[in-house]
């Protein structure tokens, strides 16, 4: 019977993943900005439908983790480096006409860019407002009567403001919701355990994905770097930094622009189609780092389990626990949880795109674990996982996808954490 159930579950999960990933490259063609990876601005699919809970089950609690919303570039090095390179090239007559036009637009925006380094943008604020309101609308049974919520964030301002946007919107939906917001070293272990300010910081082993030893199968030819340099510079001789680094910085700027309202700044120096053409290779690089750091997110998973237990037994009295952090946390957490097969660790590089797509770790990306209680048996708890507000598969057996028994999930993840320690 167990073998039959396992086969059924595998079939269901495979069909789910197939529906999501059968045309991954087609998805990139349809929306080339997805190839921006973790620079992709959050985009909610308005046609998303959620499966009704099995009869007799009612949602009562949500555990959530979200990345901050759209922001300016996260540190000053990119803007300073490009300022230095472009200014030197312009002074020495090394810019093409297209490069000079871009340089002028860049300098016009320079003060704004340098002032805004790492800060949340209006778009980032609005992303979290939308996620919050849809959460309220999707699960009215949880929020209708109000209740207590704990929200914690990293010490970064963009995360604190993302938390504020989300929580303010939720309270506007129902003023009876009481939210305690906290950005503190006391709570870092549950949201950014790797932060140097975390007094409980621990060391965990790094993991290496198996595809790395077969990376050469994916090929390494990438003419885009040279194409970009030819469009901007007559020559790069004598400029600080090597050509490949300069081209890489220009691509980093390009993919960041939609988050700060400056699309078009670079003209035709780079196109979405060109970024999309190299997406699969870029995605391999992304999978390497999210896979590598998965075990460092064990404290977050332990926090999720502990707070869920407290909500279930009533000791916390909360209807929600919300966390606001970074891609460096939610990406590895996605792998640790094995969402949509992200933990499968394929040997073939060409298979990686089918179990992880780096646009899923976009600006304001989020994981929601929604808990349902049986009206007949209070200890009978189901959980549904949403990745970016879309139902997702977990690596645990179930006979009612997308719903899983909390007892099974809890046991599975506790064992996974214990195996690493």
What do the predicted segments below correspond to?
Residues 1-23:
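Bacterial Sec-dependent N-terminal signal peptides
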Residues 20-148, 154-321, 325-421:
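Signature for phosphate-centric chemistry
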């Amino acid at each position: 019977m167990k073998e039959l159930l396992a086969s059924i579950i595998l079939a269901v999960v495979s069909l789910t993943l197939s529906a999501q990933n059968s045309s991954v490259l087609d998805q990139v063609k349809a929306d080339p900005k997805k190839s921006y990876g973790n620079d992709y601005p959050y985009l909610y699919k308005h046609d998303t439908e959620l499966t009704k809970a099995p009869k007799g089950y009612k949602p009562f609690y949500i555990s959530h983790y979200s990345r901050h919303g759209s922001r300016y570039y996260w540190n000053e090095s990119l803007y300073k480096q490009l300022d230095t390179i472009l200014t030197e090239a312009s002074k020495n007559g090394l810019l093409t006409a297209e490069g000079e036009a871009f340089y002028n637009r860049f300098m016009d925006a320079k003060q704004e860019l340098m002032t805004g380094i790492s800060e949340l943008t209006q778009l980032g604020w609005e992303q979290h407002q939308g996620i919050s309101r849809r959460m309220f609308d999707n699960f009215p049974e949880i929020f209708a009567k109000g209740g207590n919520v704990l929200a914690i964030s990293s010490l970064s301002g963009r995360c604190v403001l993302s938390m504020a946007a989300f929580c303010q919107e939720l309270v506007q939906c129902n003023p009876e919701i009481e939210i305690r917001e906290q950005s503190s070293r006391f709570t870092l272990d549950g949201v950014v355990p790797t932060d140097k300010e975390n007094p409980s910081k621990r060391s965990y082993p790094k993991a290496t994905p198996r595809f790395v030893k077969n990376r050469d199968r994916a090929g390494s030819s990438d003419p885009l770097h040279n194409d970009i340099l030819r469009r901007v510079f007559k020559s790069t001789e004598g400029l600080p930094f090597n050509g490949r680094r300069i081209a890489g910085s220009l691509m980093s700027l390009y993919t960041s622009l939609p988050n700060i309202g400056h699309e078009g700044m670079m003209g035709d120096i780079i196109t979405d189609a060109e970024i999309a053409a190299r997406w699969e290779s870029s995605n391999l690089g992304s999978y390497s780092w999210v896979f590598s750091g998965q075990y460092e997110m064990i404290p977050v998973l332990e926090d999720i389990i502990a707070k869920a237990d407290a909500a279930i037994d009533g000791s916390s009295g909360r209807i929600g626990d919300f966390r606001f952090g970074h891609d460096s946390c939610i990406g590895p957490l996605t792998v640790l949880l094995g969402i949509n097969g992200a933990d499968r660790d394929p040997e073939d590089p060409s298979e990686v795109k089918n179990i992880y797509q780096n646009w899923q770790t976009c600006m304001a990306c989020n994981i929601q674990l929604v808990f349902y209680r049986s009206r007949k048996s209070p200890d009978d708890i189901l959980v549904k996982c949403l990745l970016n507000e879309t139902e997702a598969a977990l690596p645990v057996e179930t006979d009612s996808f997308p719903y899983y028994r909390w007892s099974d999930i809890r046991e599975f993840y506790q064992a996974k954490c214990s195996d690493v320690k």
